[in-house]
């Protein structure tokens, strides 16, 4: 497995006893108590919404490493609030009080929205993995944390596509795999909605299984979201630009139009 160099990997051991905040530690301790992980190795990525940690897996899981994605506390996080991602999602708020609290932006409403957001990523991971899409294998959700397959090792994570160094042939192979996965996602009625070279991981040592698509909480259901086609086109064009700069030739708009037409006709 080819991994990216992680500056944090060498000096971020024993995080439980250093800079990790108590709520994050509690979330990760839950996975230890469940005999799913034995050690937190290093922080992989910290964003506005969550921090991902590389963990040593418990032998009983059958894995060597796992990734723990811990969503940040409500006071520290900044969730995607774009209306386009929320279209037709008010169906999640069946309780009138909950729906009103969310629409009014109260702390209670935001907390409910937060837990639904975490739950959405778990649900999307589970459904897409079951549909054969190359997403991390989901292991467990516990509160505000999700445990999943880790694409990397003790030395660091596999690189994001944005940082990957691929030959033209490997780039062509990767693009074919990504297109196949975009198609499988739509076949399962999902559009990623934020796909880019920054959330596709690459392991060029295994050309047949070299990609993992990550960051899925904002994915939309193409059957209900009226912006699904536009989001799909943006996903394809944004991702393809990276490949186009590396000599890969394709018609991103043509691929998207044909894919959408076949999905609408139930031909996928």
Where are these regions (language model features)?
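N-terminal, Lys/Arg-enriched amphipathic/low-complexity engagement segments
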Residues: 1-21, 30
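N-terminal targeting/trafficking signals and adjacent low-complexity tails
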Residues: 1-3, 18, 66, 250, ...
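Conserved ATP-binding subdomain of kinase catalytic cores across diverse folds
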Residues: 17-157, 183, 187
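Short, low-complexity Ser/Thr-rich regulatory SLiMs
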Residues: 56-59, 202-206
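Catalytic-loop Lys-Pro-X-Asn motif of eukaryotic-like protein kinases
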Residues: 135, 196-202
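AlphaC helix of the protein kinase catalytic domain
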Residues: 156-167
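C-lobe/activation-segment region of protein kinase-like
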Residues: 170-174, 186-192, 203-268
């Amino acid at each position: 497995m080819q991994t990216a160099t992680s500056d944090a990997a060498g000096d971020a051991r024993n995080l439980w006893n250093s800079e990790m905040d108590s709520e994050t530690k509690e979330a990760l301790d839950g996975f230890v108590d469940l005999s799913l992980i034995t050690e937190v190795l290093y922080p992989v990525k910290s964003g506005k919404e969550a921090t991902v940690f590389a963990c040593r897996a418990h032998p009983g899981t059958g894995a060597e490493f796992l990734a723990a994605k811990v969503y940040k506390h409500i006071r520290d996080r900044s969730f995607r609030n774009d209306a386009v991602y929320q279209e037709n999602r008010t169906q999640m708020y069946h309780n009138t009080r909950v729906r009103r609290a969310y629409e009014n932006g109260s702390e209670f409403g935001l907390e409910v929205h937060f837990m639904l957001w975490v739950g959405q990523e778990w649900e999307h991971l589970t459904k897409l993995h079951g549909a054969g899409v190359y997403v991390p294998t989901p292991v467990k959700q516990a509160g505000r944390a999700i445990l999943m397959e880790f694409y990397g090792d003790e030395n660091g994570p596999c690189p994001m596509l944005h940082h990957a160094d691929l030959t033209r042939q490997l780039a062509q192979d990767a693009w074919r795999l990504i297109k196949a996965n975009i198609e499988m996602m739509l076949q399962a009625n999902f559009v990623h909605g934020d796909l880019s070279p920054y959330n596709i991981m690459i392991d060029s040592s295994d050309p047949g299984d070299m990609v993992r698509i990550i960051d899925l909480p904002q994915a939309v259901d193409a059957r209900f979201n009226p912006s699904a086609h536009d989001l799909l086109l943006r996903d394809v064009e944004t991702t393809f630009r990276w490949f186009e700069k590396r000599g890969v030739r394709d018609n991103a708009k043509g691929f998207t139009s044909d894919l959408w037409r076949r999905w609408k006709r139930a031909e996928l």
